[in-house]
């Protein structure tokens, strides 16, 4: 049974919800599942997340927000926050919101009609969480391949301070979960102890085993 708990940690009105256990992602095994389903689906909570992230990008040119992990609602609110400030260099309001498509090899691709939103554009990558930096790195590579320039990587939670050579701005980080751990599946201490995996997790949520 996966039990989601709300930690006594908040940024503005944004709260941190987690489950403790032994979880497996595509790239690692982790001891916390970060639940951001409310922030991704509730407009009020998405706006709260956007308010926390927007100040980092008020003076950064942003043409497109690439929304990974189902964060398009947050991305839309973030665009609104960025263009809404008087100090913003994006005050013309022309920020596009784009979700990636993945091929059979889990590589990001952009169809011909979407490529103009990337090519020669300043792209901000928005993720639900950054645990190892693997997905962030691949996303930066994909944007570069299609001719775009990544101006930042941001997320609700990040276990790393940098990805693809740039700082990751997040609402919550490892200081809020000091015992958060991410392991290569070959070096997972839980597996070595014979502890069963509690759930498989990805950007859509978790599936208990």
Predicted features and spans:
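A phosphate-binding catalytic loop at a beta-strand-loop-alpha-helix junction
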Residues: 130-139, 143
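Short, well-ordered alpha-helices that flank and scaffold nucleotide-derived cofactor binding pockets
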Residues: 55, 80, 84, 141, ...
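Active-site-facing substrate-recognition patch
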Residues: 1-61, 203-209
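PRPP-dependent phosphoribosyltransferase catalytic core
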Residues: 2-9, 140-209
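Short, glycine/charge-rich flexible loops or terminal/linker lids adjacent to PRPP-binding catalytic cores
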Residues: 75-124, 132-134
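Conserved acidic residues
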Residues: 63, 121, 151
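Hydrophobic Val/Ile/Leu positions in short beta-strands of Rossmann-like dinucleotide-binding domains
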Residues: 67, 125-126
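Short glycine-rich phosphate-binding loop at a beta-alpha junction
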Residues: 60-70
């Amino acid at each position: 049974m996966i039990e989601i708990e709300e930690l006594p940690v908040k940024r503005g009105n944004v709260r941190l919800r987690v489950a403790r256990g032994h979880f497996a992602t595509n790239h690692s095994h982790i001891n916390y599942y970060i639940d951001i389903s409310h922030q991704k689906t509730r407009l009020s909570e998405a706006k709260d997340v956007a308010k926390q992230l927007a100040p980092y990008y008020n003076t950064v040119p942003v043409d497109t927000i690439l929304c990974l992990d189902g964060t398009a609602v947050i991305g839309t609110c973030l665009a609104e926050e960025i263009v809404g400030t008087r100090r913003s260099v994006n005050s013309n309001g022309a920020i596009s919101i784009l979700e990636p498509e993945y091929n059979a090899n889990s590589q990001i691709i952009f169809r011909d009609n979407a490529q103009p939103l990337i090519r020669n554009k300043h792209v901000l990558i928005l993720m639900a969480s950054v645990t190892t930096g693997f997905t962030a790195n691949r996303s930066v590579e994909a944007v570069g391949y299609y001719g775009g320039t990544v101006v930042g990587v941001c997320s609700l939670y990040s276990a790393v301070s940098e990805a693809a050579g740039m700082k990751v701005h997040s609402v919550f980080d490892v200081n809020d979960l000091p015992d958060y751990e991410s392991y290569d599946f070959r070096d997972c201490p839980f597996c070595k102890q014979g502890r069963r995996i509690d759930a498989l997790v990805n950007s859509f949520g978790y599936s208990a085993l």
